[in-house]
């Protein structure tokens, strides 16, 4: 129980810094009124990961109350939250690779370009795989791969190939 108590206190301190940093990161991504808080609630019984239940509370609007992310955030808001959270984790952990699978869902234009900047910056420290349909994100990449499906007589096969310079411009 002593270790669980120490972990709980560390979570409380870290959660405040995390919330503050996340808000600073997400404001330039077109969410100027974002409020974010990590609620750390005691469990009745300790478990292997400690004695806390953790909830991410969020609002993108000035007048809206903070609610659990899953209940209130749109697809585009979740995309931006996930990008910021992954970028923060990557800043504290020596990850060799980070994968973004359509993290740009629900965004476009200038916001997508700014999200691409974040991924490009991460790419200076680690390998970044970004699955995207947006040119603003793809343009930031060093290498591009084309993923496609091909039908054979018996089944459909997914294939991948590296794109050459001319294909990247299309």
Q: What does each of the following model-derived ranges do?
A:
Residues 101-102:
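Walker B catalytic acidic pair
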Residues 110-170:
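C-terminal lobe/lid and adjacent interdomain/linker elements of RecA-like ASCE P-loop ATPase modules
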Residues 92-93, 105-113:
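Conserved D-loop-proximal element of ABC-family nucleotide-binding domains
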Residues 60-63, 76-98, 122:
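GG-anchored amphipathic helix commonly corresponding to the ABC/SMC/Rad50 NBD signature/C-loop
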Residues 38-42, 58-62, 85-87, 148-149, ...:
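Flexible glycine-/small-residue-rich
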Residues 1-45:
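Charged, surface-exposed helical/loop "interaction arms" that form contiguous linear patches used
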